[in-house]
Swiss-Prot record:
Pfam families: Methyltransf_11. It comes from Pelagibacter ubique (strain HTCC1062). NCBIfam families: UbiG (TIGR01983). It catalyses: a 3-demethylubiquinol + S-adenosyl-L-methionine = a ubiquinol + S-adenosyl-L-homocysteine + H(+); a 3-(all-trans-polyprenyl)benzene-1,2-diol + S-adenosyl-L-methionine = a 2-methoxy-6-(all-trans-polyprenyl)phenol + S-adenosyl-L-homocysteine + H(+). The gene is ubiG. S-adenosyl-L-methionine binds at residues 36, 66, 87, 129. This is Ubiquinone biosynthesis O-methyltransferase. Pathway: Cofactor biosynthesis; ubiquinone biosynthesis. O-methyltransferase that catalyzes the 2 O-methylation steps in the ubiquinone biosynthetic pathway. The lineage of its organism: Bacteria, Pseudomonadati, Pseudomonadota, Alphaproteobacteria, Candidatus Pelagibacterales.
């Protein structure tokens, strides 16, 4: 059994060259990235009681699952974390490696999914950001991800809620009307309700500590953390 959805991998491999183009196919992710980075950084600092510095994450071992071209791996590395980035798309990893080398960043990138990591070393923090809606089997994926997390470690999972509003905004609006994303980027049937995600995680020794919405304000072109989880949401789990 594995968590890889070949159709999804092919879809993202086709546009892999555009990962680092802020005006390309991944423009929405570039706009979304600053709030994700801030949320992750602030929560890690708080939970691990880190005294902030230039490199606040310097003692943190972090695994970025479904890292794509490295949009989150690189900022985490710059913040001092020891980063491993994995993705099932060889093309994505090639792009990520090239960009990290160009920027003299030491990131360990591998073509893999969680169940494929052979050394099974444990991490302080795992990022599953905008990935669970693209995997083959979410239960298996969370189970395998959880195995890689240290006791009391943090797992961040960000995804899309399965609501009428998410269908209207994330698919009809973002893909068909505003053309922010290529048509077919998302499949509403694979969106996950927070209650489902919490249940699956609970079965895998993960306790929910935080659940927040992330909403886009079209008027000022910015993302904000809110209580509204009806479209995009982010969770923080702690390993029991």
């Amino acid at each position: 059994m594995n968590s890889i959805n070949k159709k999804e991998i092919e879809k993202f491999s086709k546009i892999a060259e555009e990962w680092w183009d802020p005006n390309g196919k991944f423009k929405p992710l570039h706009n979304f990235n600053p709030i994700r980075i801030r949320y992750i950084k602030e929560n890690i600092i708080k939970d691990f009681k880190i005294r902030s510095s230039d490199k606040p994450l310097k003692n943190i071992k972090l695994l970025d699952i479904g890292c794509g071209g490295g949009l989150l791996s690189e900022p985490m590395c710059r913040l001092g974390a020891s980063v491993v980035g994995i993705d099932a798309s060889k093309k994505n990893i090639e792009v990520a490696k090239f960009h990290a080398k160009k920027n003299k960043l030491k990131i360990d990138y591998k073509v893999a999914s969680p169940e494929m990591l052979k050394d099974k070393k444990k991490f302080d923090v795992i990022l599953n950001m905008e990935i669970v809606e693209h995997v083959n089997d979410i239960d298996f994926f969370i189970k395998e991800s959880s195995k890689l997390l240290k006791k009391n470690g943090i797992m961040f999972i960000a995804t899309l809620n399965k609501t009428l509003k998410s269908y209207v905004f994330a698919i009809v609006g973002a893909e068909y009307i505003l053309k922010w994303l290529p048509i077919g980027t998302h499949d509403w049937e694979k969106f996950v309700k927070p209650s489902e995600l919490i249940d699956i995680s609970k079965k895998n020794n993960l306790s929910l500590k935080k659940l927040d919405g992330m909403n886009f304000n079209i008027l000022d072109n910015s993302w904000k953390v809110t209580n509204d989880t009806s479209v995009n949401y982010i969770t923080k789990f702690i390993k029991n």
